[in-house]
A protein has these predicted regions:
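Juxtamembrane helix-loop boundaries in multi-pass membrane proteins
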Residues: 1-20, 52-79, 97, 113-141, ...
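Early transmembrane hairpin module of multi-pass membrane proteins
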Residues: 28-39, 49-68, 92
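Hydrophobic, membrane-facing alpha-helical anchors
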Residues: 40-56, 100-117, 162-174
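Conserved helix-loop functional segments at active or binding sites
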Residues: 83, 145, 170-173, 177, ...
Length: 202
Protein backbone atom coordinates (compact mmCIF):
# COMPACT_ATOMS: atom_id res chain seq x y z
CA UNK A 1 0.00 0.00 0.00
CA UNK A 2 3.04 2.27 0.26
CA UNK A 3 3.03 2.48 -3.52
CA UNK A 4 -0.43 4.01 -3.44
CA UNK A 5 0.34 6.26 -0.47
CA UNK A 6 3.52 7.60 -2.11
CA UNK A 7 1.95 7.96 -5.55
CA UNK A 8 2.60 11.56 -6.66
CA UNK A 9 -0.47 13.38 -7.95
CA UNK A 10 1.71 14.66 -10.78
CA UNK A 11 1.17 11.23 -12.34
CA UNK A 12 -2.17 12.57 -13.58
CA UNK A 13 -0.22 14.39 -16.29
CA UNK A 14 1.17 11.04 -17.43
CA UNK A 15 -2.35 9.57 -17.44
CA UNK A 16 -3.55 12.39 -19.68
CA UNK A 17 -0.63 11.81 -22.04
CA UNK A 18 -1.27 8.05 -22.18
CA UNK A 19 -4.95 8.44 -23.03
CA UNK A 20 -4.07 11.10 -25.62
CA UNK A 21 -1.52 8.81 -27.27
CA UNK A 22 -4.19 6.13 -27.52
CA UNK A 23 -6.26 8.50 -29.63
CA UNK A 24 -3.32 9.25 -31.90
CA UNK A 25 -1.96 5.71 -32.31
CA UNK A 26 -5.29 3.96 -32.69
CA UNK A 27 -3.75 0.55 -33.41
CA UNK A 28 -2.38 0.58 -29.85
CA UNK A 29 -5.37 2.30 -28.25
CA UNK A 30 -6.32 -0.77 -26.20
CA UNK A 31 -2.86 -0.92 -24.61
CA UNK A 32 -2.89 2.79 -23.78
CA UNK A 33 -6.43 2.45 -22.43
CA UNK A 34 -5.48 -0.40 -20.08
CA UNK A 35 -2.36 1.35 -18.77
CA UNK A 36 -4.21 4.64 -18.29
CA UNK A 37 -7.15 2.93 -16.59
CA UNK A 38 -4.87 1.18 -14.08
CA UNK A 39 -3.25 4.50 -13.21
CA UNK A 40 -6.66 6.19 -12.84
CA UNK A 41 -7.70 3.54 -10.33
CA UNK A 42 -4.43 3.99 -8.42
CA UNK A 43 -5.16 7.71 -8.09
CA UNK A 44 -8.71 6.94 -6.95
CA UNK A 45 -7.38 4.42 -4.42
CA UNK A 46 -5.06 7.06 -3.01
CA UNK A 47 -8.03 9.41 -2.69
CA UNK A 48 -10.04 6.74 -0.83
CA UNK A 49 -7.34 5.11 1.30
CA UNK A 50 -5.16 8.13 2.00
CA UNK A 51 -7.66 10.95 1.74
CA UNK A 52 -5.89 13.28 4.18
CA UNK A 53 -2.52 13.15 2.44
CA UNK A 54 -4.27 13.41 -0.93
CA UNK A 55 -6.07 16.61 0.06
CA UNK A 56 -3.00 17.95 1.85
CA UNK A 57 -1.03 17.65 -1.37
CA UNK A 58 -3.76 19.49 -3.26
CA UNK A 59 -3.63 22.31 -0.71
CA UNK A 60 -0.40 23.49 -2.37
CA UNK A 61 -0.33 25.69 -5.46
CA UNK A 62 1.67 23.52 -7.87
CA UNK A 63 -0.17 20.22 -7.24
CA UNK A 64 -3.55 21.96 -7.48
CA UNK A 65 -2.60 23.79 -10.67
CA UNK A 66 -1.55 20.53 -12.33
CA UNK A 67 -4.40 18.37 -11.01
CA UNK A 68 -6.58 19.61 -13.85
CA UNK A 69 -4.80 16.99 -15.93
CA UNK A 70 -6.80 14.40 -13.98
CA UNK A 71 -10.16 15.92 -14.88
CA UNK A 72 -8.98 16.27 -18.47
CA UNK A 73 -7.89 12.62 -18.45
CA UNK A 74 -11.34 11.60 -17.20
CA UNK A 75 -12.94 13.39 -20.14
CA UNK A 76 -10.77 11.47 -22.62
CA UNK A 77 -11.25 8.25 -20.62
CA UNK A 78 -15.01 8.59 -21.07
CA UNK A 79 -14.63 8.56 -24.86
CA UNK A 80 -12.91 5.16 -24.64
CA UNK A 81 -15.81 3.73 -22.62
CA UNK A 82 -18.66 4.99 -24.80
CA UNK A 83 -18.40 2.40 -27.63
CA UNK A 84 -17.83 -0.63 -25.40
CA UNK A 85 -21.16 -2.02 -24.24
CA UNK A 86 -24.20 -0.20 -25.51
CA UNK A 87 -26.29 1.37 -24.09
CA UNK A 88 -24.97 1.02 -20.53
CA UNK A 89 -21.48 2.17 -21.46
CA UNK A 90 -22.90 5.33 -23.04
CA UNK A 91 -24.58 6.31 -19.79
CA UNK A 92 -21.51 5.51 -17.70
CA UNK A 93 -19.23 7.31 -20.14
CA UNK A 94 -21.43 10.40 -20.17
CA UNK A 95 -21.49 10.37 -16.37
CA UNK A 96 -17.68 10.23 -16.19
CA UNK A 97 -17.44 13.02 -18.77
CA UNK A 98 -19.73 15.22 -16.68
CA UNK A 99 -17.80 14.37 -13.50
CA UNK A 100 -14.58 15.39 -15.25
CA UNK A 101 -16.11 18.74 -16.19
CA UNK A 102 -17.43 19.32 -12.66
CA UNK A 103 -14.02 18.53 -11.16
CA UNK A 104 -12.30 20.91 -13.55
CA UNK A 105 -14.75 23.74 -12.94
CA UNK A 106 -14.29 23.17 -9.20
CA UNK A 107 -10.52 23.44 -9.62
CA UNK A 108 -10.97 26.73 -11.47
CA UNK A 109 -13.13 28.15 -8.67
CA UNK A 110 -10.92 26.92 -5.81
CA UNK A 111 -7.68 27.96 -7.50
CA UNK A 112 -9.04 31.41 -8.34
CA UNK A 113 -10.23 31.93 -4.78
CA UNK A 114 -7.02 30.71 -3.12
CA UNK A 115 -4.33 32.03 -5.46
CA UNK A 116 -5.80 34.86 -7.54
CA UNK A 117 -8.34 36.68 -5.38
CA UNK A 118 -6.37 35.85 -2.22
CA UNK A 119 -2.64 35.36 -1.63
CA UNK A 120 -1.71 36.45 -5.16
CA UNK A 121 2.02 36.54 -5.83
CA UNK A 122 3.34 37.06 -9.35
CA UNK A 123 6.30 34.79 -8.59
CA UNK A 124 3.85 31.96 -7.92
CA UNK A 125 2.50 32.23 -11.45
CA UNK A 126 3.63 29.37 -13.68
CA UNK A 127 2.60 27.99 -17.06
CA UNK A 128 0.74 25.30 -15.11
CA UNK A 129 -1.94 27.95 -14.55
CA UNK A 130 -3.02 27.17 -18.11
CA UNK A 131 -3.95 23.66 -17.03
CA UNK A 132 -6.42 25.29 -14.67
CA UNK A 133 -7.89 27.90 -16.99
CA UNK A 134 -7.49 26.52 -20.51
CA UNK A 135 -7.74 22.82 -19.67
CA UNK A 136 -11.53 23.12 -19.71
CA UNK A 137 -11.27 23.11 -23.51
CA UNK A 138 -10.84 19.34 -23.23
CA UNK A 139 -14.61 19.29 -22.72
CA UNK A 140 -14.94 20.89 -26.14
CA UNK A 141 -12.56 18.40 -27.75
CA UNK A 142 -14.43 15.40 -26.32
CA UNK A 143 -18.00 16.75 -26.56
CA UNK A 144 -18.58 15.48 -30.15
CA UNK A 145 -18.21 11.89 -28.88
CA UNK A 146 -21.49 12.45 -27.05
CA UNK A 147 -23.13 14.55 -29.79
CA UNK A 148 -22.87 17.57 -27.51
CA UNK A 149 -20.83 19.88 -29.72
CA UNK A 150 -23.13 22.79 -28.93
CA UNK A 151 -22.13 22.56 -25.28
CA UNK A 152 -18.53 21.93 -26.22
CA UNK A 153 -18.48 25.29 -27.97
CA UNK A 154 -19.34 26.94 -24.64
CA UNK A 155 -16.33 25.34 -22.96
CA UNK A 156 -14.13 26.31 -25.88
CA UNK A 157 -15.36 29.89 -25.47
CA UNK A 158 -14.53 29.85 -21.76
CA UNK A 159 -11.01 28.59 -22.45
CA UNK A 160 -10.50 31.04 -25.29
CA UNK A 161 -11.61 34.00 -23.17
CA UNK A 162 -9.36 32.97 -20.28
CA UNK A 163 -6.44 32.44 -22.64
CA UNK A 164 -5.69 36.16 -23.11
CA UNK A 165 -5.36 37.27 -19.46
CA UNK A 166 -3.40 34.14 -18.55
CA UNK A 167 -1.11 34.62 -21.56
CA UNK A 168 -0.32 38.15 -20.42
CA UNK A 169 0.10 37.15 -16.79
CA UNK A 170 2.22 34.06 -17.37
CA UNK A 171 4.39 35.74 -20.02
CA UNK A 172 4.96 38.77 -17.78
CA UNK A 173 5.97 36.51 -14.93
CA UNK A 174 8.55 34.59 -17.01
CA UNK A 175 9.97 37.71 -18.66
CA UNK A 176 10.08 39.94 -15.59
CA UNK A 177 10.95 37.40 -12.88
CA UNK A 178 13.40 35.00 -14.42
CA UNK A 179 14.45 33.28 -11.21
CA UNK A 180 12.63 29.93 -11.18
CA UNK A 181 13.35 26.81 -9.16
CA UNK A 182 14.71 24.00 -11.32
CA UNK A 183 11.81 21.71 -10.40
CA UNK A 184 9.33 24.25 -11.82
CA UNK A 185 11.18 25.08 -15.05
CA UNK A 186 9.64 22.22 -17.13
CA UNK A 187 6.21 23.86 -16.86
CA UNK A 188 7.29 26.22 -19.64
CA UNK A 189 6.59 23.45 -22.19
CA UNK A 190 2.88 23.86 -21.40
CA UNK A 191 2.97 26.95 -23.65
CA UNK A 192 2.92 24.67 -26.69
CA UNK A 193 0.42 22.13 -25.36
CA UNK A 194 -2.45 24.41 -24.60
CA UNK A 195 -2.34 26.49 -27.73
CA UNK A 196 -2.40 23.17 -29.55
CA UNK A 197 -5.56 22.30 -27.60
CA UNK A 198 -7.23 25.51 -28.71
CA UNK A 199 -6.25 24.87 -32.32
CA UNK A 200 -7.72 21.36 -32.15
CA UNK A 201 -11.02 22.87 -31.06
CA UNK A 202 -11.32 25.24 -33.99
Amino acid sequence: MNIIKNLPLAITGLILAIFSLGKIFTEFSSIFFIIGTVLVFLVLLKFILHHDSFMNELSNLIPLSTFGTFSMALMIFSTYLKPMFMPISQTIALGIWIIGIIIHLSIILIFTKDYVLNNFDIENVFASWWIVYIGITMAAITAPAFDLSQYGFIFFGIGFILMTPTLILVSYRYLKFTSIEDKNKPFICIYAQFYQSLLLDT
